[in-house]
């Protein structure tokens, strides 16, 4: 993930096709020792591909992934009068989960 993040930073910064040394340079600025084999694999996989198209395709794939929230909402709706209270509780629970999962237990460049 850290190699991909460095690659994306370089492309956003204006490099159309970042080299292995460019990626190593970005990673070294935050104290990460880069593995050249992984960098070469990343570059080979992304060579000649449009980053924006890859991101769009990834978003489409993520949109098809089912989430756990839909299953808990169905029984609440069937309960009739309890639905508004259940919706509020679900919103509060979702808000708490968002706050607790901000870094999801790992850093971007760890």
Curated annotation (Swiss-Prot):
GO terms for biological process: cytoplasmic translational elongation; transcription elongation by RNA polymerase I. Residues 76-110 are annotated as: Disordered. Keywords: Cytoplasm, Phosphoprotein, Ribonucleoprotein, Ribosomal protein. Residues 76-87 have a biased composition (Low complexity). The modification Phosphoserine is found at residue 100. Residues 95-104 have a biased composition (Acidic residues). This is Large ribosomal subunit protein P2A. It comes from Schizosaccharomyces pombe (strain 972 / ATCC 24843). The gene is rpp201.
């Amino acid at each position: 993930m850290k190699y991909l993040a460095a690659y994306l930073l370089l492309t956003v910064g204006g490099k159309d096709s970042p080299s292995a040394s460019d990626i190593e340079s970005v990673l070294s600025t935050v104290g990460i020792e880069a593995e050249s084999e992984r960098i070469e694999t990343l570059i080979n996989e992304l060579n000649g591909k449009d980053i924006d198209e890859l991101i769009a395709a990834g978003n489409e794939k993520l949109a098809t992934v089912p989430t756990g929230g839909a299953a808990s909402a169905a029984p609440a709706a069937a309960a009739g009068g309890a639905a508004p209270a259940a919706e509020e509780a679900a919103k509060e629970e979702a808000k708490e989960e968002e706050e607790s999962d901000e870094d999801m237990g790992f850093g971007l460049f760890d």
